């Protein structure tokens, strides 16, 4: 990736979806954008107005006929001169157009996320908005889309900028007391008010971090693990939840030996359900490995569904784990006298109890996530920097025996950590990581 500020070349990339398609969009950004469209279109389109033109190579051969739009700097996505070619989405058409663009001097194919990185470099967005756009592109459920839109709309940026300004103002009061301690127009000992304000800010940030766990669940998904003895109906339940045959079903015990995972969309919340090897004593080395993996996945679960065949002898045993566990009686169509032992009774043969269980899973997911309406930290990077901010605030508040100069320095560091979240202070070392998450063309 080029260094920020050294964008002397013009970049281009296919910004629309997979080919072939009805329409393909090729985006261009950089100082030679005007030269590019004048060369290919032999015309100068009016800014922000679509023009229907023929696209030609440098030797005059027609490539396609389509629309071009021009967005002059600084009022464009990247802050540079930008253009979009809208052409037919045939593979040969797009490949020819990209080849022609690549032959123009000063033009090259864009790297992943480079358009967005240029937008950041030119002050069109901060890092949290860029991350929100990445999450919006990756969103697969309605809940993920809503969360990503909150971030991409700038809610995080506004909150963190406000907190940072409060720290800067508080530090200014302390430095004023240091510089003008003998002056009559400086209020007597404003520092006590400052420490109270910092304490309130610390509690706000702590509450904000706590809400991040729910956001992480929505962004990364909840994890439900199905466990039980061999032939308890685990694979049959997984197939029902998936709506297709994911797992092999057999009367032979020990058929499932590895982890099988499906992703569900329950009310806009991503939920990953994992089928595991049957828990039992075995001499099979392969099956033992599967059982070890099952127990490891259980330890990471948000919810465990412990299945037992209701038609056989009752021997309900639950592995000792921290996650919430539901006891599920299976094969309810075959009967069972001890049905009160289980939270739910299901039969994949008749469908009995399955919709009730599915509704319960959705209710569980919704209760775990709750309503996320305010700005929340959506990435571990945010949480790490927020914790570092709190640590410096605590040092400033609790440093009664320290000189005010040192406590003011703690406040400066705290505001710097907040600034690193939004990119207001130097974050060069993490930019490649953030923008590499985008596809080429974004």
Swiss-Prot record:
It is an enzyme of class 3 (hydrolase). One of its GO terms (biological process) is tRNA methylation. (6S)-5-formyl-5,6,7,8-tetrahydrofolate binds at residues 27, 84, 124, 442. Its EC number is 3.6.-.-. It is found in: Cytoplasm. Mg(2+) binds at residues 235, 256. The keyword Ribosomal protein does not apply. Residues 221-366 form the TrmE-type G domain. Its cofactor is K(+). Binds 1 potassium ion per subunit. GO terms for cellular component: cytoplasm. Pfam families: MMR_HSR1, MnmE_helical, TrmE_N. Homodimer. Heterotetramer of two MnmE and two MnmG subunits. NCBIfam families: mnmE_trmE_thdF, PRK05291.1-3, small_GTP. Belongs to the TRAFAC class TrmE-Era-EngA-EngB-Septin-like GTPase superfamily. TrmE GTPase family. This is tRNA modification GTPase MnmE. It comes from Brucella canis (strain ATCC 23365 / NCTC 10854 / RM-666). The gene is mnmE.
């Amino acid at each position: 990736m080029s260094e920020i500020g050294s964008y002397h070349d013009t970049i281009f990339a296919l910004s629309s979806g997979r080919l072939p398609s009805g329409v393909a969009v090729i985006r261009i950004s950089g100082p030679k954008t005007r030269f590019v469209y004048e060369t290919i279109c032999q015309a100068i389109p009016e800014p922000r107005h679509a023009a229907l033109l023929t696209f030609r190579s440098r030797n005059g051969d027609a490539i396609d006929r389509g629309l071009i739009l021009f967005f002059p700097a600084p009022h464009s996505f990247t802050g540079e001169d930008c253009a979009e070619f809208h052409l037919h989405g045939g593979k040969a058409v797009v490949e020819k157009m990209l080849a022609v663009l690549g032959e123009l001097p000063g033009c090259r194919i864009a790297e992943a996320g480079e358009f967005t990185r240029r937008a950041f470099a030119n002050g069109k967005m901060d890092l949290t908005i860029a991350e929100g756009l990445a999450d919006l592109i990756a969103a697969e459920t309605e809940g993920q889309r809503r969360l990503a839109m909150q971030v991409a709309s700038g809610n995080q940026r506004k909150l963190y900028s406000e907190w940072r300004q409060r720290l800067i103002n508080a530090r200014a009061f302390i430095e004023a007391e240091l510089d003008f301690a003998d002056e009559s127009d400086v209020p007597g000992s404003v520092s006590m008010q400052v420490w109270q304000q910092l304490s309130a800010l610390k509690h706000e940030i702590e509450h904000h971090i706590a809400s991040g766990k729910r956001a992480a669940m929505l962004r990364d998904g909840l994890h439900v693990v199905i466990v039980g003895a061999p032939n308890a109906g685990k694979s049959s339940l997984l197939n029902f939840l998936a709506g297709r045959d994911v797992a092999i079903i057999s009367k032979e015990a020990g058929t499932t030996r590895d982890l099988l995972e499906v992703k569900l969309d329950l009310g806009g919340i991503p939920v990953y359900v994992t089928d595991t090897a049957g828990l039992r004593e075995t001499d099979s080395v392969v099956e033992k490995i599967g059982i070890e993996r099952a127990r490891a996945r259980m330890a990471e679960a948000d919810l465990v569904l412990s299945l037992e065949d209701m038609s056989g002898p009752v021997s309900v045993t639950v592995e000792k784990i921290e996650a919430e566990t539901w006891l599920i009686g299976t094969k309810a169509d075959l009967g069972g006298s001890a049905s009160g032992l289980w939270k739910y009774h299901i039969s994949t043969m008749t469908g009995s109890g399955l919709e009730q269980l599915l509704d319960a899973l959705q209710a569980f997911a919704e209760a775990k996530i709750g309503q996320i309406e305010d700005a929340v930290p959506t990435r571990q990077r945010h949480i790490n920097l927020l914790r570092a901010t709190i640590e410096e605030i605590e040092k400033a508040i609790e440093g009664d025996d320290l000189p005010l100069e040192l406590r003011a320095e703690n406040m400066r560091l705290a505001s710097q950590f907040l600034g690193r979240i939004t990119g207001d202070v130097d974050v060069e070392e993490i930019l490649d990581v953030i923008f590499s998450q985008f596809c080429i063309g974004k």
